[in-house]
Amino acid sequence: MPAPRAPRALAAAAPASGKAKLTHPGKAILAGGLAGGIEICITFPTEYVKTQLQLDERSHPPRYRGIGDCVRQTVRSHGVLGLYRGLSSLLYGSIPKAAVRFGMFEFLSNHMRDAQGRLDSTRGLLCGLGAGVAEAVVVVCPMETIKVKFIHDQTSPNPKYRGFFHGVREIVREQGLKGTYQGLTATVLKQGSNQAIRFFVMTSLRNWYRGDNPNKPMNPLITGVFGAIAGAASVFGNTPLDVIKTRMQGLEAHKYRNTWDCGLQILKKEGLKAFYKGTVPRLGRVCLDVAIVFVIYDEVVKLLNKVWKTD
């Protein structure tokens, strides 16, 4: 006589007691790099506007009256493609940045999960912090320094950099490798807090959505919404650090003795509001940025799980 079947409700609940599936760091590196490259091609114009507004210091007569005026002046002077000036430097950095970030996050989280393979919010924050520090030191600081110098140079009356690689050669020739690591402290603080906030929020929302089933599938729409929320939280949490980082990496960084001096000078000469200059364009870019990255990352990991067996 055949054994009776388990009730449907119990069968459906079975996965809840299973162990959460882990993501191999190698998969995370590939998926993260692809996601980072696609995302930056979509969102770069808002990054360009944000950087222009932050470099438009109050100590000089303002060049732009706001976001719209910055876009109008750029398009009038250089055409629509002017909003993509400096894209190459950011694109070259975005792919390895996302690869390092997700690879490090998965590496750390795989060692910090509980016996069931679950990651709580606090550990998600710590893993995000580690991922942010890693991407800051390995990729973000040198690439962001070059990007800001390149954009700043292109808006000067007589640009001296003919392209990305020429700009890198000139910066290294004139300032040495140290010239590509300006604002390292601010960058580590910014990226560390950035990813700590994002992964804390993302981990919290995912745990809430999945409940007792850590392997519950998430469709791209849900992932995108959660990513946008995480992005918004990070913007309001560390925009002042982003402003300081941008100033420390600009062509006039020599005006500041160090990161702390930069912050004090901005506060003294321009007031507290200067720390939130460029917040609106950054908010739109980051929300879209984080949503796109997490959606593409998750979907690529799903694909890799089918063709790359690591269990």
Swiss-Prot record:
The chain crosses the membrane at residues 29-46, 86-105, 129-143, 183-202, 224-241, 278-297. Possesses a short cleavable presequence, which, however, is found to be dispensable both for targeting to mitochondria and insertion into the inner membrane. However, the presequence is required to keep SLC25A1 in a soluble state and thus in an import-competent state. Mature SLC25A1 lacking the presequence is prone to aggregation. The keyword Protein transport does not apply. It comes from Homo sapiens (Human). Changing residue 282 to C: In D2L2AD; abolishes citrate transport. Solcar repeats lie at residues 23-111, 122-208, 218-303. Residues 1-13 form a propeptide. One of its GO terms (cellular component) is mitochondrial inner membrane. Changing residue 262 to R: In D2L2AD; reduced rates of citrate transport. GO terms for molecular function: antiporter activity; citrate secondary active transmembrane transporter activity; citrate transmembrane transporter activity; tricarboxylic acid transmembrane transporter activity. It is found in: Mitochondrion inner membrane. Belongs to the mitochondrial carrier (TC 2.A.29) family. GO terms for biological process: mitochondrial citrate transmembrane transport; monoatomic ion transport; negative regulation of ferroptosis. Pfam families: Mito_carr. It is a multi-pass membrane protein. It is linked to Combined D-2- and L-2-hydroxyglutaric aciduria: An autosomal recessive neurometabolic disorder characterized by neonatal-onset encephalopathy with severe muscular weakness, intractable seizures, respiratory distress, and lack of psychomotor development resulting in early death. Brain imaging shows abnormalities including enlarged ventricles, delayed myelination, and germinal layer cysts. Myasthenic syndrome, congenital, 23, presynaptic: A form of congenital myasthenic syndrome, a group of disorders characterized by failure of neuromuscular transmission, including pre-synaptic, synaptic, and post-synaptic disorders that are not of autoimmune origin. Clinical features include easy fatigability and muscle weakness. CMS23 inheritance is autosomal recessive. This is Tricarboxylate transport protein, mitochondrial. Disulfide bonds: none annotated. Its main location: mitochondrion. Changing residue 28 to T: In D2L2AD; uncertain significance; very mild decrease of citrate transport rates. Changing residue 247 to Q: In CMS23; reduced rates of citrate transport. The modification Phosphoserine is found at residue 156.
